[in-house]
């Protein structure tokens, strides 16, 4: 059974968030958390928060299972474009440049590993 978490209206451009999403796609949850904690990207903080929420949602949906981070993996991560706020920046000769402040929606889906590796 899978669980998902959605973070909406994040004030980061979707392009920057997709770079972070690509780092953790398909990884084990404990490995993904380590990657996000050590990442220098600002968007990784929001991605880590959403990943922790997805793991908590999995535990909430499956109360009779005790599942650790090493038994879960990031099944899919996708970033959708959110609302774009249009602002004006004063420019020379009485003109104005348009500034687009972009946002995104981050969705993380976690699932249990089918055949856990024994170490």
Curated annotation (Swiss-Prot):
One of its GO terms (molecular function) is structural constituent of ribosome. GO terms for biological process: translation. Keywords: Ribonucleoprotein, Ribosomal protein, RNA-binding, rRNA-binding. The keyword Cell cycle does not apply. GO terms for cellular component: cytosolic large ribosomal subunit. Disulfide bonds: none annotated. It holds the Pfam family Ribosomal_L22. Part of the 50S ribosomal subunit. This is Large ribosomal subunit protein uL22.
